[in-house]
């Protein structure tokens, strides 16, 4: 975890500050416990997102079931609803971050929504495996105790009849 924190700190405190681009943005997750360590020292446009806090981008509502997420998001004061086949609260958080990035790049809300609806997720991260048996099968390459705990909590929250872990 320390290497992850140090890599993020380097990204925000070094690379972003030394970028020659005029429109530089730091997009930070207020739900991360160490977020204040990543706030750039020099003035850079800094935007925040959160699953629950009133920030630049946050969830107004989230309905999660085995078929995916139905989200109502507020991004820079604009509210929109979107449905995605991805599951897991971490995906809702990633969608907020991506939506904020889209806003900074002046991408239309409609285009952002259509992009989210077409997302299939990252291979190996609660990836749905299609089959003709009507069984919900997911693959996740969680290899740390915390990652495995998060995957199991997500799947248990969806109330499957039976959960088999291989």
Predicted regions and their residues:
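Active-site beta-alpha connecting loops in nucleotide-dependent enzymes
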Residues: 122-124, 146-166
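Short, glycine/acidic-enriched loop or turn micro-motifs at the edges of active sites
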Residues: 32, 143-144
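Switch II (G3) loop of P-loop NTPases
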Residues: 137-143
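Loop/helix-junction capping segments adjacent to catalytic residues or to phosphate/diphosphate-binding pockets
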Residues: 92, 145-146
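Acidic, Mg2+-coordinating active-site environments of NTP-dependent enzymes
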Residues: 1-137, 160-161
């Amino acid at each position: 975890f320390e290497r992850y924190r140090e890599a993020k700190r380097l990204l925000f405190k070094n690379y972003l500050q030394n970028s020659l681009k005029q429109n530089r943005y730091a997009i930070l997750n207020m739900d991360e416990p160490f977020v204040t360590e990543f706030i750039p020292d020099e003035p850079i446009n800094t935007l925040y997102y959160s699953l629950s806090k009133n920030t630049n981008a946050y969830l107004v509502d989230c309905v999660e079931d085995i078929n995916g997420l139905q989200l109502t998001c507020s991004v820079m004061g604009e509210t929109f609803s979107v449905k995605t086949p991805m599951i897991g609260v971490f995906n809702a958080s990633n969608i907020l971050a991506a939506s904020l990035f889209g806003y900074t790049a002046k991408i239309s809300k409609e285009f952002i929504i259509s992009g989210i609806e077409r997302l299939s997720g990252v291979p190996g991260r609660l990836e749905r495996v299609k089959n003709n048996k009507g069984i919900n099968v997911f693959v996740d390459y969680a290899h740390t105790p915390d990652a495995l705990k998060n995957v199991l909590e997500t799947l248990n929250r969806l109330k499957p009849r039976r959960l088999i872990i291989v």
